[in-house]
UniProtKB/Swiss-Prot annotation:
Protein purpose: Major tuberous root protein.
Source species: Ipomoea batatas (Sweet potato)
Signal peptide region: 1-23
InterPro entries: Kunitz_inhibitor_STI-like_sf, Prot_inh_Kunz-lg
Pfam families to which the protein is assigned, alphabetical: Kunitz_legume
SMART domains hit by this protein: STI
SUPFAM superfamilies with a match to the protein in the record: STI-like (SSF50386)
PROSITE patterns cross-referenced by the UniProt entry: SOYBEAN_KUNITZ
Name recorded for this polypeptide: Sporamin A
Superkingdom, natural source: Eukaryota
Length: 219
């Protein structure tokens, strides 16, 4: 009887396990090591000030030393006419490129960026006329590496507004970025991917998040 009970329990446990085949981002379901902040919680910069919707900020690694600096738009794909890759600067003192953060909702009264709510991100940098719209963030699959990279390009709203800023450490005002599948509650960490061939650190969907702080560009 005990053997039968144990077998039934094991079978039920296996049945209840999430099926990674159901996710097109297999196998990196978002870990839930941190409780998400309330949607009523504003995102704060390194000075403790609220991050303003539509404002320009730097997103800089919260880890000093080997952690690198801020996020930059880079031209890694020589087949592309525009820079489309998001990288972590190897220089701790480099804040990266200015980034505009805007709530995905079209509420004109949304003046503050709130944690755990959908946001759109775009690089606010000078480009040539051909690449002027290739600054919006989105996730794109790379068949060669099998990774889902954070890219900049002419992404439609269904792709570019699926990001959330989640609180990691309230004492440090540090955060992580998550990407949620459109029409689904499945979310994934955006973390580092060390591209040894190109000798750079890129951002991609990952089990381990890229933890960052937000700096105003006028600092």
């Amino acid at each position: 009887m005990k053997a039968l009970t144990l077998a039934l329990f094991l079978a039920l446990s296996l049945y209840l396990l999430p099926n990674p085949a159901h996710s097109r981002f297999n196998p990196i379901r978002l870990p839930t090591t941190h409780e998400p902040a309330s949607s009523e919680t504003p995102v704060l910069d390194i000075n403790g000030d609220e991050v303003r919707a539509g404002g320009n900020y730097y997103m800089v690694s919260a880890i000093w030393g080997a952690g690198g600096g801020g996020l930059r738009l880079a031209h890694l794909d020589m087949m592309s006419k525009c820079a489309t890759d998001v990288i972590v600067s190897p220089n701790d003192l480099d804040n990266g490129d200015p980034i505009t953060i805007t709530p995905a909702t079209a509420d004109p009264e949304s003046t503050v960026v709130m944690a755990s709510t959908y946001q759109t991100f775009r690089f606010n940098i000078a480009t040539n006329k051909l690449c002027v719209n290739n600054v919006n963030w989105g996730i794109q699959h790379d068949s060669a590496s099998g990774q889902y990279f954070l890219k900049a390009g002419e992404f439609v709203s269904d792709n570019s507004n699926q990001f959330k800023i989640e609180l990691v450490d309230a004492n440090l005002n540090s955060y992580k970025l998550t990407y949620c599948q459109f029409g689904s509650d499945k979310c994934y960490n955006v973390g580092r991917f060390h591209d040894h061939m190109l000798r750079t650190t890129r951002l991609a969907l990952s089990n381990s998040p890229f933890v960052f702080v937000i700096k105003p560009t006028d600092v």
